[in-house]
Amino acid sequence: MLLMMGTADLGRVFYYSIAVTNAAREAARQGTYYDPTANPPANGYDDYADVLAAARSEVPADVTLNLPTGAPSHCLTGAPSSWRVYYPTQPNSGYVYICFDGNDSQSGPAQQTIQVNILYSFSPVTPLAGVVGADMVQVLASTTMQVQTQQ
């Protein structure tokens, strides 16, 4: 019985991992879109609210994605192994770090690159997971894309 529940949790974490990865990719894609028909030609979706909305639209309804509340607010630095302290403590929730041009304090739209990192905390339903120290499984998805411009 526990083996079946553990297998179900493994399938669930795989499912949510794929959903979070797709959300990061779609959010970055949203921020890179260039509309040549706009007057003047520009990227009308290159802001934090639109990028976050794109990420939220790609995850299941039981997943909560928000912008982080503390520093760093947009760009994560260092190796991903050092980001452990930035994961949300609430189960089945994630923080979306949206980094325009590698600048944590940038207020305007990205001109070169957009990086979207999603740090997601998955909570297994199997009580056996707590025995092996997996009360929360941390899932990371990261995507960097080049901002489109008029050639």
Model regions and ranges:
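N-terminal single-pass transmembrane signal-anchor helix
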Residues: 1-12
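Short, conserved structural patches
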Residues: 17, 25-151
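Alpha-helical transmembrane segments
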Residues: 12-22
